[in-house]
Amino acid sequence: MAGHSKWANIKHKKAAADAKRGKIWTRLIKEITVAAKLGGGDPDSNPRLRLSMDKAMDANMPKDNIQRAIQRGVGGLEGVNYEEIRYEGYGLSGAAIIVDCLTDNRTRTVAEVRHAFSKHGGNMGTEGSVAFMFTHCGQFLFAPGTPEDKLMDAALEAGADDVVTNEDGSIEVTCPPNDFSAVKAALEAAGFKAEVADVVMKPQNEVDFTGDDAVKMQKLLDALENLDDVQEVFTNAVIEE
């Protein structure tokens, strides 16, 4: 990826998410509930629950809210039943987009996602149409200036798959999804706290957008991210700042 893009794009996405803190809490409560429902209420034996709890704590969510979501998931409290749905589609220039949702009404969600695609110059694809262009992995991004050799040693010892230094000086570490929490803990114990850390669908190749096309593509991504049922949006589009 071009040096200007990796750090700027991921930091921009994080800032935009932080600006919608209230919505972030709503999404995280849904994710914690579903994670507990599918894998049980013990984060030590449920990596997905551990990740969602870590995100909630990073977002300053009160512990009571987190515990209520877990209880709802394991059946201790009444609540809405959510199902996971993934939609795939295309933006401008055939850029690939994955939209992960948690919903209590599949009909409503697919209509809203399809409308967002069509309104902003994209189109829905079929299941599997773009997912093969991404790799499911844990991803950590460290700021330019992080000592590369020490980070690489710590990351590989922790079980990371790869460590890449981008042209802009930022360093990216990837690992298997199920090892995310262990790698994160090991890196932090070694003194390395990532600016951004998450389990993602990482694009294998990227499409650069500049000028008017960048503006249009960003509007499509924003429209999808702003839908209530949408949890995550992944794309291989790189938007020029």
UniProtKB/Swiss-Prot annotation:
Pfam families the UniProt entry points to: TACO1_YebC_N, Transcrip_reg
Q: Which keywords label this protein?
A: Cytoplasm, DNA-binding, Transcription, Transcription regulation
Record's GO cellular component, any one?
cytosol
From the Swiss-Prot or TrEMBL record, state where the protein is found: Cytoplasm
In its UniProt record, a GO molecular function of this protein is: DNA binding
A GO biological-process term: regulation of DNA-templated transcription
List the Gene3D superfamilies hit by this protein, alphabetically. 1.10.10.200, 3.30.70.980
Similarity comment: family membership: Belongs to the TACO1 family.
Q: What is this protein called?
A: Probable transcriptional regulatory protein Reut_A2522
